[in-house]
Amino acid sequence: MRVALGIEYDGSRYFGWQRQAEVDSVQAQLERALSFVANEPISIQCAGRTDAGVHATGQVVHFETNAVRKESAWTLGVNVNLPDDIAVRWAKDVDDEFHARFTATARRYRYMIYNHQFRPGILRSGVSHYPGQIDEAKMHEAAQFLLGEQDFTSFRAIQCQSNTPFRCVHEVNVTRQGMYICVDIKANAFLHHMVRNIVGSLLEVGYGRQPVSWIKELLALKDRTQAAATAKPNGLYLVDVTYPEHYALPKLALGPLFMLD
C-alpha cells in the first residue's frame, strides 16, 4: 500500500532534507521513525528537497509499505519516534498513481524577514534578520515581473541540476505584518535556490539600492552573476504543495505559526 504524509520541520540543525552519509537530515530521521513503526525498511519520496537550514510546514511525502497500520500509527506513532523538531501533521492512504513529487502541480514558499533594528531572540532560527528601512510595497511591485512562465537563469544556483531554467510563477506577494515582511511565492516548481535568490534581489529594491524595474532587467539578462546575493536560509519555509483535487489531501493553515493566516 502507498501512504502520503504531511510533514513540518524546523530545518535549523539538519543538513537539508536529503539523506546523506555522516550528517543528519530530515529524510533520514523520518525514514528511521517510519521503519520502526512499520517494522520494515521504509524509503520515502518528497515533494521538494529543502536545503540546509530551510523549514517546512507543508512538506508532503509518500512511501510504500506492506505493514497494515491505523492512521494513528503513521501520525502519533511516528511522532513519538521523531525528534521534537520534525512532526507528522496528517496521514492518508493514496493510490499507486500518487507520487509526492511528480503528481504535484504547484509548490508554495514563504520567506520571513524580521525587519527590526535589533536581532530577534525567540524566533532567530525561523526568520532572517534584515535591519534598516525596507519598502515592502516596492518589493511587491518589482515581484510582479516574475509572474508567468519565464527563464529564471538569473535566479538559479550555479549547481542547479534542472534540465531547463524555465518555471511558471503563479502568484507572488510581498506583505508586512508589523516587523515581519513575508515574501509569498507559488510556482509549478522551483530551481535550486530560486526563492532565496529572488528574495535577495527583491531586498535590493526594498532598500532602495535598485529600481523596481531591475527585476525585469535581471530576467532579461539571464545571468546569475548580475543578481544579488542569495538570501539567508533560515527565513524560508515550504508551506504548501498542490495536488489534483481528487486526492482530497488535508489542507491546514500554511504557517509559519506566527503568521496571521
Swiss-Prot record:
Catalytic residues in the record: 51
Keywords per UniProt: Isomerase, tRNA processing
Entries under CDD domains matching the protein: PseudoU_synth_EcTruA (cd02570)
Top-rank EC class of the record's enzyme: isomerase
Assigned EC number: 5.4.99.12
One GO term (biological process): tRNA pseudouridine synthesis
SUPFAM superfamilies from the UniProt entry: Pseudouridine synthase
Reactions catalysed according to its record: uridine(38/39/40) in tRNA = pseudouridine(38/39/40) in tRNA
Keyword set includes Isomerase: yes
tRNA processing in keyword set: yes
GO molecular function list: RNA binding; tRNA pseudouridine(38-40) synthase activity
Residues that coordinate or bind substrate: 109
Cited function: Formation of pseudouridine at positions 38, 39 and 40 in the anticodon stem and loop of transfer RNAs.
Assembly notes: Homodimer.
NCBIfam families, sorted: hisT_truA
Family under the similarity heading: Belongs to the tRNA pseudouridine synthase TruA family.
Protein name according to UniProt: tRNA pseudouridine synthase A
